[in-house]
Amino acid sequence: MSIISQIEACDFERLYEIEQQAHLVPWSFGTLKNNQGERYLNLKLIENNQIIGFAICQTVLDEATLFNIAILPTYQGCGFGKLLLGKLIFQLKEKGVQTLWLEVRESNSARFLYEKIGFNEVDIRKNYYPKPSGGRENAVVMACYL
């Protein structure tokens, strides 16, 4: 059974492990810890008593930005990202948020999940993300009107 709840201080070591495995260019431990506070709605996803994913989202007035979402690679493609995003959107609506923004690598297959949930492509940021092998990759800016 899946449980989704607020991220706690004791979760960061596990979140960092997931971050390192889930992203092409992962956040540092410091960046992960610094994206916390009263303006954030940060959730963890627990399956079989183990954290397998998380979402980092900042809220400002009636808008929110999804800064990071990560699901452990062995659990990707099983609906856990959709489950976590659904809970995040539900809680954002309860807070009066009207628009959820995100940006994603052009090559990231999560774009298709975002589109299914209701996100629309708003803009392209040319050469925004660095590639581990060198060079740059475009970012796709997306918005979901709640």
UniProtKB/Swiss-Prot annotation:
<dbReference type="GO" id="GO:0005737">
    <property type="term" value="C:cytoplasm"/>
</dbReference>
<comment type="function">
    <text>Acetylates the N-terminal alanine of ribosomal protein bS18.</text>
</comment>
<protein>
    <recommendedName>
        <fullName>[Ribosomal protein bS18]-alanine N-acetyltransferase</fullName>
        <ecNumber>2.3.1.266</ecNumber>
    </recommendedName>
</protein>
<comment type="similarity">
    <text>Belongs to the acetyltransferase family. RimI subfamily.</text>
</comment>
<dbReference type="InterPro" id="IPR050680">
    <property type="entry name" value="YpeA/RimI_acetyltransf"/>
</dbReference>
<feature type="active site" description="Proton acceptor">
    <location>
        <position position="103"/>
    </location>
</feature>
<dbReference type="GO" id="GO:0008999">
    <property type="term" value="F:protein-N-terminal-alanine acetyltransferase activity"/>
</dbReference>
<feature type="domain" description="N-acetyltransferase">
    <location>
        <begin position="2"/>
        <end position="146"/>
    </location>
</feature>
<dbReference type="InterPro" id="IPR000182">
    <property type="entry name" value="GNAT_dom"/>
</dbReference>
<feature type="binding site">
    <location>
        <position position="108"/>
    </location>
    <ligand>
        <name>acetyl-CoA</name>
    </ligand>
</feature>
<dbReference type="InterPro" id="IPR016181">
    <property type="entry name" value="Acyl_CoA_acyltransferase"/>
</dbReference>
<feature type="binding site">
    <location>
        <begin position="69"/>
        <end position="71"/>
    </location>
    <ligand>
        <name>acetyl-CoA</name>
    </ligand>
</feature>
<keyword id="KW-0963">Cytoplasm</keyword>
<dbReference type="InterPro" id="IPR043690">
    <property type="entry name" value="RimI"/>
</dbReference>
<dbReference type="Pfam" id="PF00583">
    <property type="entry name" value="Acetyltransf_1"/>
</dbReference>
<dbReference type="InterPro" id="IPR006464">
    <property type="entry name" value="AcTrfase_RimI/Ard1"/>
</dbReference>
<feature type="active site" description="Proton donor">
    <location>
        <position position="114"/>
    </location>
</feature>
<keyword id="KW-0012">Acyltransferase</keyword>
<keyword id="KW-0808">Transferase</keyword>
